[in-house]
Amino acid sequence: MTKLTVAVFSYNRGAYLEFCLASLARNLPHAQVVVYDDLSDDPATQAVLAALKVPLVQPSAVARAQHGGLYVNMARALAEVETDYLLFLQDDMQIVRRVDDQDFADIAAIFDADPDCGFVSPLFMKAGIARKLHAQYQSAQGLAAYQTSPEIPRAEMRFAFADVCLAHVDRLRDAGFTVVEGEGHNEAQAREKFSQMPLMSAPFAFYCPEVPTFRNRKRPLSGQIARLRRRPEGLGYHDMTAAEVADFRARDPAIWPFAEDFLTPQNPQVRKPFVFQDFQGPLALRVLARVEYLLLSGGRRLRRLRAKLGI
């Protein structure tokens, strides 16, 4: 019986979508996979979508929110899923090792240990937020997970939800959890309804490094420049070998699963610690990206103010 549905959210990154789906076929072959595409208009991506061997869902109209139709599609996936678990995944991600019965047993044990648990993170940890993670989590005795430190009050939980996570479908529905626009709003809702999201100590998924990024469905200038200098080497990571997975599972849980310590990029020239947007490479591009963001956010604030004033 299929226990897991993987909802892959896609927009204009055809090569990455292919790469993501190939990793699912290799490493999570028994999962039900559905692609939710936000009406990609890139010809190369459209060609990938036309050749899909898994179900494709697209909206009837283009979403105008900052994140496009991501949250609308996440809500639709949650409404339509018929399996025990739902993995929210994005097209710029990879399943980096074989997922087996031991993993499903670990996941079930994590949920069984806490009836208030609605989400589990299957992701390797980002080195850039190590301090925040150490402040909020500790190794969970008897579970293949890191859980919230007991002294952390619910109001101070910072990882109740993430756009990429593994959801316990029945618990979300029983609690009346619905995906709304904005990760912060979803996290606030999750904080009210559930305990903080545990992190798997033997995760199996991660973000590809230095990926093309969109804002309001458009490539920023910094991203366009980054694309011109993009190295042609591999998009993601080498799959972990069986021996590496065995050592990974057997390690002391005091050694946290930070991606840089366990994953080997196909392109050895990617920046470390890993960055996940292509304009986060050279300093000049990072500065340009920051200026673009400030101009964009300032423009939104001005439009909201003018709307309130009726001018």
Tell me what each language-model feature is.
Residues 1-22:
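N-proximal low-complexity "stem/linker" segments adjacent to membrane-targeting elements
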Residues 41-82:
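Active-site-proximal specificity loops/subdomain of glycosyltransferases
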Residues 86:
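Short aromatic/hydrophobic "clamp" motif used to bind/position activated sugar donors
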Residues 98-119:
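Conserved donor-nucleotide/metal-binding helix-loop-beta segment in metal-dependent transferases, i.e.
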Residues 115-134:
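Short beta-strand-to-loop element that shapes/binds the nucleotide-sugar donor at the catalytic cleft/hinge
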Residues 174-311:
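C-terminal catalytic/acceptor-binding lobe
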